[in-house]
Amino acid sequence: METLTAISRWLAKQHVVTWCVQQEGELWCANAFYLFDAQKVAFYILTEEKTRHAQMSGPQAAIAGTVNGQPKTVALIRGVQFKGEIRRLEGEESDLARKAYNRRFPVARMLSAPVWEIRLDEIKFTDNTLGFGKKLVWQR
């Protein structure tokens, strides 16, 4: 099974991403519902510009983050660690991403928050269902 295909299949079944941003030595993390685009290897999220993490990100920033489930047993642990870049989308790019996001999360139609893209440049997927400590690694 191809590494990116396996990772993408799992990410498509999840819906919450955690990412951390750094600015002038200060770190901050945030969570959001996401839409995963397997073709672009990117998450799309909504977050207000006034939030601390958006203020620290500015229009574009390097980030790191995770997506994980909450299994009750070690043998079922699966999760992704990643590094990449977050940027606020504008214009047609934003409109297309928002339409796709709203299809996944219809309640988001009521939100006016800007759309952001988290482009994944490196992914490490831990999947204990394939054997304890099994890691799949992908890089752009």
Swiss-Prot record:
Annotated InterPro entries: Split_barrel_FMN-bd, UPF0306
Alphabetized HAMAP family for the sequence: UPF0306
Coiled-coil annotated residue ranges, if any: none
Protein name per UniProt: UPF0306 protein YhbP
Transmembrane segments: none
Domain of life: Bacteria
Similarity annotation: Belongs to the UPF0306 family.
Disulphide connectivity of cysteines: none
Database matches in Gene3D superfamilies: Electron Transport, Fmn-binding Protein, Chain A
